[in-house]
Amino acid sequence: MATSALGAVLLTGCSLGDFGDINKNPNRPSEAQTDMFFTYACTYTYDFTLNSYYYNPWTQMFNGYVAERNTLQYGKMNILEFDTSSYYLYPLKNLKYIIDLNSDDATKNTVAVTRFGSNKNQIATAVTLQAYFYMHLTDILGPIPVKEALQAGEDNYTPAFDSVEDIYSYLDEKLKEAYALFDESGSLSSADIIFGGDVSKWKKLNASLRMLMAIKLSDVAESVGKSRFAAAYADGGIVDDGDSMIYRFDSNSPSPLYSNGVNYNSNFCPNEYIVEALKDYGDPRLFCYFSLVPFRGSAPVGDASDPAAYVGMKLGIPNVSDYAEKVCYFSESLSAAEGLLPIITAARVNLVAAEAAERGWISADAQSLYEAGVKASFEQWGAEDVDVYLASDKVAYAGTKAQKLEKIAMQRWLSGYMADGVEAWSDIRRLHVPVIEVGRPAVGITHIPYRMKYSGAIAASNKKNYESAVSAAFAGTNDAEHRIWWDVK
C-alpha cells in the first residue's frame, strides 16, 4: 500500500493536525472526563466521507466521485480489506465510557462528567453517535459485533457477530430510547465539535439515522421499513441546511485537504462520472464542486465559466497519466484551511424522505420533499438558479413512479459529492443509479465492490465468530462479490 504525507493525514483518522488536547488519547477510565472522550470520538466522524487509515479514497471512488490522476493503483478496486479495530478501540469505546460514567451513581454527578452536560443528554448523544458508527460499519462489511461489543472489561474478548438485520433492529430501538432521553432545555459544552452543543440538532440526527436505515429495507422487509421510517419521520430529521452534520476545521486545525492540497491534486482528481453528469444536467454545482486551479495561488488552466473546460478522469483505466493534464481539480472551497466536510446533509435526508413518500411510506408530498432536497444542496454549495434547474426536463419531478424514484436517486448522488461516501455507495448498491462501470477489461473486474472484506486482523482475533458470520452471510467466502443483507438486486 502506498504511503505519503497524504496517506498519513488526509485519510488517517488519528492524524488530523494539531487539535491540542483533542489528539491526546483520553481513552482510559482513569481520565474520566466525558467532554474529552466525546471530542476525540467526534474526530472519527468524517472517516466515511474521507475514509480513515488508508491512502485509498474508496469512499469517494466507488461512487464515481474521485479517480486517480497519475497511476492506476486503487482504481483496480482490489485493495478491499477493511479493519474495524480502531473504531471499537477509540470512538465506540469512548462513547461507552460516556454512557457508563453518566449512569454510575459514583461518577455521574462529578464535575469531570457534568461539565459536558446533563446525564440524560450525554447518554442520548453518545448512543446516537454509537449508532452512527455501527450503521456505517455494518453497511461496509455486513455482520459485525454490536450487542456483545465493548465487553473486554467483562472478559468477553471474542464477541459474537450480529446479522445486519438484527443490527438494524437493535439500533432502531436504541435510537428511539435515546431520542426520548434528550432534553432540549439543556445543552452540551463546546466539546461537541459537530453541533456546538445544540441538543435539538442531535435529536434531528437521531431521527435521520433511523430514516437512513429504514429506507434500505425497501427490498427485504418493506413493512418493517415503512413502520420504522414513519416513526422517525414523525420525530423530525435534518431538513434545513443549517442542521446538517458537518465536520468543521479551523485555522489552528486546518482541513487535511488544505494541509495536503498539493499531494491531493497531484494524485487524485474528479471522476468523469460526476463531471459529465453535472454537465449533462446543466447543473450549476459543477462550478462549486470543481476548479481549474491546479494549486493554491496558481492561475486557472482554462475558462472557469465554460462547462466544457471541466473534464474528469475515467475510473479504472490503465493509462491515467495520459490524461493527467487534461482533467480538472477539486474546488478550492473544499481545500480551504477552515474547510468543511459534509457528512449527513439536509439534502440527503430530504431526498430519502422523498423516496419514502413516493413509495407511500409517509403522508407527505414527494415532489415537495424532492425539491427541498435539491434546494438544500444548492444552498449548501452556494449554487444559483435552483428554480430554473428544477424546471428543466431532466430534473422536473414528472413521469412514472419508477422514473420518479430514479430522479430521486440521481439527485441524491449528484448532491452526495464529497459527503458521506458510504451512504452514496449504499444507494448505488441498492438502487443502481447511476450505474458505475470501471475500466474493464484492463483491471479485471466488472463492477464496483458489493462490500468490503473483513481484514485479516478481524479473522485472526475472533476466528470462531468470524467464520460463523462469513458462513451465515456470505456462503463461507469473505469476498467483495457477496452482497449486504439489504442489497438483493
Kindly give the residue locations of the regions a language model identified:
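Sec-dependent bacterial lipoprotein signal peptides
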Residues: M1-G13
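Long, intrinsically disordered, low-complexity segments
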Residues: T12-C14, S259-G282, L286-F290, P300-D303, ...
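Membrane-proximal, proline-rich intrinsically disordered regions
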Residues: C14-N70, N78-E81, L89, Y97, ...
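Structured, solvent-exposed acidic/aromatic patches
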Residues: E31-T34, V66-L129, F133-E384, A398-L405, ...
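Beta-strand acidic-aromatic groove motif in beta-rich domains, primarily in extracellular
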Residues: L50-W58, G142-P145, K226, G421
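Residue-level detector of short coil/turn "hinge" positions at structural boundaries
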Residues: S52, S363-A364, S415, V435
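C-terminal beta-barrel architecture of Gram-negative outer-membrane proteins
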Residues: S377-E379, Y389-D393
